[in-house]
A protein has these predicted regions:
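Surface-exposed, interaction-prone regions used to assemble/regulate multi-protein complexes
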Residues: 1-136
Length: 136
């Protein structure tokens, strides 16, 4: 199992949808989770052949320090790796930083966030997913 670490300063080429410049100080305005209905006709006993769920992060990146073009991030077939810390149920969330890694054809996104209404104020969420779409 090889694991590649992709960050803004990494010499490796990140995926085309990744926000290479960073989203520091972007505001997460909405977090939506959606479970797709199971399609028995398309099921081939292989897990990666269909979309099971989607996590959509709607952002206001106008105040971000670097990349202000990102409007929404969709993570397909996601799973929280930090089940005690998720993105749902928080007040105002601010993006501090992130790290994207690739392992066995899946992505892992570790997001560092700030929630001024929670204790502790800073939190880290790790999410594994199979593919992503970024709306700019």
């Amino acid at each position: 199992m090889t694991k590649r670490n992709l960050q803004a300063h990494s010499p490796e080429s990140p995926p085309e949808w990744y926000w290479v410049k960073g989203l520091h100080d972007a505001h997460i305005t909405l977090v939506e989770s959606f479970e797709f209905p199971f399609d028995y006709d398309r099921y081939t006993r292989e897990k990666n052949t269909y979309d099971r769920n989607c996590l959509t992060l709607t952002l206001d990146a106008a105040g971000a320090m670097f990349d202000t073009s990102v409007k929404a991030i969709r993570l397909y077939n996601y799973k929280y790796l930090t089940p005690e810390t998720t993105l749902e149920g928080h007040g105002t969330l601010w993006w501090i930083g992130d790290r994207l890694t690739v392992s066995d054809g899946r992505f892992e996104l570790e997001i560092h966030l700030y929630d001024g209404e929670a204790f502790p104020e800073e939190l880290t969420v790790r999410i594994r997913f199979e593919r992503a779409e970024v709306e700019r």
